[in-house]
Amino acid sequence: MAKKPIKITEVVLRDAHQSLLATRMTMDEMRPILPEMDKIPYFSVECWGGATFDSCIRFLDEDPWERLRILRKELPHQKLQMLFRGQNMLGYRPYADDAVEYFVKKSVANGIDVIRIFDALNDARNLQTAIKSANKEGAHVQGCISYTLSPVHNNEYYVKYAKTLEEMGANSICIKDMAGLLTPYTCYELVKELKNTLSIPVDIHSHYTAGLASMSLLKGIEAGADIVDTAMSPLSGGTSHMATESPVSYTHLSAMRAASSLVR
């Protein structure tokens, strides 16, 4: 039986410029590429949430909700994805449950399809309201493992936490390696253990800060990861992500799970 092709989440419209350009990309700077991006069969396009909401208001004199509506109109064939900080929403402190519920409701109503939800401390209690609300609104809920290194943060810990998120209602799990600390063989082992334990897809999100991401994602693909996060090459590398062209090219030229349908 043929292996399922690897899927791509494109982060150039959110995490890539948040990492390299302090989230200063304007809507006018995004618009020229959107028609071409809409032709590519991504799993999702991450384009909202994280620091974009704050940056639109604080620095760019833009309405973040209007940005989302424009992206929804310009990318009609894509699943739009946002990053959501659980009980902190898109802010920097915890908010009341009813605020979280209403924000999730309006995010989906204005065009969001996939909500990636994380808590920096991996405290599942801070994700309960967001996961429940996102499921209620019909969004794809992606629960996150916030990856780090410490005496207690090992693969057993992460697999147990991921299983908790699945039981809470997550539709997929993201290994969210914000600092670029995930090494290739650790990634392989972690993905293998997650795939053996979970019944939902596994996504790998790893920043290029330490120069490890391309090798780590490759080993993750070999281990059975379903989705990888990448950024188109002009905004890849550094503190951003592996270039989208890399896994597409490699899987196309090898016997791996080809992502070559993304080639244009």
Question: Which residues make up each language-model segment?
Answer:
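Hydrophobic faces of well-ordered beta-strands that scaffold small-molecule active sites
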Residues: I8-V11, V45-C47, L80-F84, I115-R116, ...
